[in-house]
């Protein structure tokens, strides 16, 4: 199968691969900040088989019913939840599913930071798999609301496309409160590690843009800057989920 279509829609990544035997379509949809739905469909109605390997030996792998867990030494981890009929097999190195529903299947990938959030992540994944179409619609409606507040009838279509892309970039760079980050915010980029924090010189601009379509996130973006305000009133350069990496200049 060769990839022939890749499209990043607002709120959804779409990939299609084709061969002489048919095509396979994948949709990756962020249900919320820590839950991702992967929908896979095939035109030739074959049974799907999935497998994966863990790349480092420091992580602990296990399975709970139809969920494969990978937990790092920090307690953070990833849960991959399959439909109950998938027949999940797992060991210390990875996982494999024996079979799933012919022609179509849905998988939920969840991220968690500790044992308490691990439990809620699995519960959320189970809920998503039970009502896939409902969660897809909720996500589509959320993005529709973002764009409705930005797209303007008095602007050329080319400008509206730039505005939509700006919204997609800001929301895609949304980082939730975690560790020493006490409020949500937007990071400048996922391209390099040092951009994975909240920077003073970017955060104000992020907040101004977000105020038009995600006002609560805009407020949190400002709040997080004041979480590390110095006694003399200064807002420091950048802050991270590990405060030892903060740059207080």
Locate each region found by the language model.
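Accessory carbohydrate-recognition regions in carbohydrate-active enzymes
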Residues: 1-13, 31-35
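Aromatic-rich carbohydrate-recognition surfaces in CAZymes
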Residues: 139, 196-249
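Acidic/polar, glycine-enriched structural segments that form the non-catalytic walls/loops
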Residues: 19-37, 41-196
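Aromatic/His-enriched, Gly/Pro-containing loop or helix-boundary segments
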Residues: 12, 18-27, 237-249
């Amino acid at each position: 199968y060769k990839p022939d279509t890749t499209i990043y829609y607002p709120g959804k990544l779409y990939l299609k691969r084709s061969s002489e035997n048919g095509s396979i379509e994948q949709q990756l949809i962020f249900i919320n900040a820590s839950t991702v739905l992967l929908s896979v469909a095939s035109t030739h109605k074959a049974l799907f088989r999935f497998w994966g390997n863990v790349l480092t030996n420091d992580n602990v792998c296990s399975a709970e019913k139809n969920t494969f867990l990978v937990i790092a030494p920090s307690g953070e981890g990833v849960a991959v939840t399959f439909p109950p009929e998938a027949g999940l097999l797992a060991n210390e190195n990875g996982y494999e599913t024996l079979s799933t529903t012919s022609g179509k299947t849905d998988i939920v990938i969840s991220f968690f930071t500790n044992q308490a959030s691990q439990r809620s992540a699995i519960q959320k994944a189970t809920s998503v798999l039970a009502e896939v179409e409902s969660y897809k619609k909720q996500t589509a409606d959320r993005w529709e609301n973002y764009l409705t507040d930005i797209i303007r009838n008095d602007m050329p279509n080319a400008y509206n496309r730039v505005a939509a892309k700006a919204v997609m970039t800001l929301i895609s760079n949304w980082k939730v409160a975690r560790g020493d980050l006490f409020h949500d915010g937007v990071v400048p980029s996922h391209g390099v590690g040092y951009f994975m924090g909240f920077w003073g010189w970017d955060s104000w601009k992020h907040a101004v843009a977000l105020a038009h379509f995600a006002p609560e996130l805009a407020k949190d973006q400002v709040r997080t800057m004041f979480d590390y305000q110095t006694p003399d009133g200064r807002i420091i350069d950048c802050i991270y989920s590990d405060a030892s990496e903060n740059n207080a200049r």
